[in-house]
From Swiss-Prot:
Biological processes, Gene Ontology terms: defense response to virus; regulation of transcription by RNA polymerase II; toll-like receptor 3 signaling pathway
Gene3D superfamilies: Winged helix-like DNA-binding domain superfamily/Winged helix DNA-binding domain
Gene Ontology CC terms: cytosol; focal adhesion; nucleoplasm
Organism of origin: Mus musculus
Assembly behavior: Interacts with BRD7, IRF2BP1 and IRF2BP2. Interacts with CREBBP in growing cells; the interaction acetylates IRF2 and regulates IRF2-dependent H4 promoter activity.
Subcellular location: Nucleus
PANTHER family named in the record: INTERFERON REGULATORY FACTOR, INTERFERON REGULATORY FACTOR 2
Regions of compositional bias (Polar residues) in chain numbering: 230-239
Covalent cross-link (Glycyl lysine isopeptide (Lys-Gly) (interchain with G-Cter in SUMO2)), residues: K137, K260
The protein, known as: Interferon regulatory factor 2
SMART domains: IRF
Post-translational modification: Acetylated by CBP/ p300 during cell-growth. Acetylation on Lys-75 is required for stimulation of H4 promoter activity. The major sites of sumoylation are Lys-137 and Lys-293. Sumoylation with SUMO1 increases its transcriptional repressor activity on IRF1 and diminishes its ability to activate ISRE and H4 promoter.
Family statement: Belongs to the IRF family.
Lineage: Eukaryota, Metazoa, Chordata, Craniata, Vertebrata
Residues recorded with modification N6-acetyllysine: K75, K78
Gene giving rise to this polypeptide: Irf2
Amino acid sequence: MPVERMRMRPWLEEQINSNTIPGLKWLNKEKKIFQIPWMHAARHGWDVEKDAPLFRNWAIHTGKHQPGIDKPDPKTWKANFRCAMNSLPDIEEVKDRSIKKGNNAFRVYRMLPLSERPSKKGKKPKTEKEERVKHIKQEPVESSLGLSNGVSGFSPEYAVLTSAIKNEVDSTVNIIVVGQSHLDSNIEDQEIVTNPPDICQVVEVTTESDDQPVSMSELYPLQISPVSSYAESETTDSVASDEENAEGRPHWRKRSIEGKQYLSNMGTRNTYLLPSMATFVTSNKPDLQVTIKEDSCPMPYNSSWPPFTDLPLPAPVTPTPSSSRPDRETRASVIKKTSDITQARVKSC
């Protein structure tokens, strides 16, 4: 248990009346005005018996210092005493009469009577502006709960629900008000939306073309197109009958060009029907254009060559002396003539 001790104000009165501390005295006992020696000993060094007897007595009274056991610390004693004086609600400093410089520095204080003591030191009374701001903050809550005639007819449960919601409704949550059938339907629509509309159910896509003007009001729903007829035609045409395979085979014909015989399948290629343009260009796709181009190929790449054993080969043509050139000369004679020409040119030079 902490030891009960005398409070600071009666303790100070006792120290002043004892006249044991030099410089501590009453200036006006009727008005409870007194002075305390307040030397700045840090400048010239501490003299405990002269500069800090009051601070030492307060440290001993509060148990912060034990004579003969603790080392003297007048600087700490003075700081603790100043903090205790500033925390008292019934003692205030008379600053216009205090002298804080020089060798005879002191501070003057006054003990306040009971009638002048504030209820709690440090707490300022509320101003009119703070009261007005608080009143304005309470008005919107009261006005939202009141009816058009100024009389509030809402129950406390509904008031708590309304203040918690604050007109913020989630589109995925349905808010249900229980036990409020007596409320007006118009007020319910204004305060709470019990069934908010479900959104994001239909995705709309806009299309534009050269013929049609761009208009944001003309919206078309997004649809998945069915399988095109071109894909169906591919599946049906991929499986051909034996007759079609026979018709698709190339027919080889004999042809002779400049006395030489060749095998050719020109003019026997089958024509393949391609899907019409209506398959790709429809009224739903006004901007789509498809161009199909087929390169000419004299012979299919996947066809095989027929055997040549059944076909008669032409007899080899042997050259005859009549077919040779009459002015044909041997290689040796040509070399001899050229050598004679070069020698003649050298001599002429």
